[in-house]
Amino acid sequence: IISDTIFEIGLTPNRADAMSHYGVARDLLVALKFKKLIESNTFLKDLPKKNDLTFNKNDSLNINIENPELCYRYSGIIIKNINVKPSPIWLKEKLESIGLKPINNIVDITNYTLHYFGQPLHAFDLDKIKGNIINIKSPKKETSFITLDGVERKLDFEDIMICNGEKEMCLAGVFGGLESGVSNTTKNIFIESALFNAISIRKTAKRHGLNTDASFRYERGVDSNMVIPALIKASQLILELSGGEIDSEIFDFYPKKQDDYNFEINFDNVRKIGGFDISNQEIIEILKLLEIELEIVKDNMAKAIVPNFRNDVKREIDIIEEVMRIYGYNNISISDKINSTPSIPVLKNNHNVQQKISNHLVSLGFHEMINNSLTKDLYIINEKEYRNKEIALLNPLSKDT
């Protein structure tokens, strides 16, 4: 890296929306606008749209999703006559700055787009897709599969697999297959952009001991509305850096649309729970900047409609936290009053008796001991009273317990 400024951001697992450069910029824009540090007419760059590409609809694939509960959305595009080669310096430096090793222009573009938008992509060698068929399904029998790292893995019946007309090609949302991946001789490719079930991806990643950039994001939740823009962005870069032409329409199978969340909030609760004075108008302004729409129900009540990319905001308390976060915790003054309600616990009689006996014995000079309930089996092995009654630990920390 010749010269660059790198920010390392610590994210909590619930903030899947900020696991990309676009997501961080979107959140930063909200804070800067509310604090009047930038002009109110400042906006993020428009997301790529279908009319940004020129399509030659000569080729097609038959795509089938076996279980829509495991694959919510599956999209892709065919690009032919590409030239696989090393990436230009600017792209290599971008990837190296975030700790990624450049491989070739096609793979590098998918990685770049992943970190740009937070949407995982995968490139298949089109000529390896036998029968022009893509099936998204789980294995029906025990079988082995060789991943990109050359390791042979036994598939589980719960794994989601991307298959062609003959066999498996990819561990969906986790890791690609060795045979179907892009190589230096690849001329035609199929770019996949999809949305898989987060729980299923997490189980597969843990089962096979794989923690990839793709699985990391799928486990935490991916924005369904970013599937197509990311695919278009990657296609634009591929045409620019490797040549070729688009030879299909955008395939987009979306059998079960992901709806926005909606629930009621009370403006008074924001003030009461947050512990600060904020007007309804300020609350509305913050939520509007966060792209959370409000439909006023009555005076201090409203229905909040939360965009799909904020899968961590599902309750009123989440809204309150968001308002406080953007308003600024440092701007919330600490009360000079402390309210407390002292209470005297009522102890059970047997505990009272025990305490009185303990106190009396201590006053006479005795010492009270609390022994570890865990002990060596050696100590009781010859005691008939305890033989065959001991409870063994499955995973003891040492031989002494």
Regions found by a protein language model. Name each.
Residues I1-N350, Q355-I357:
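RNA/tRNA-interacting regions in translation and RNA-turnover enzymes
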Residues Y329, S335-T401:
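Polar, glycine-rich mid-to-C-terminal structural blocks
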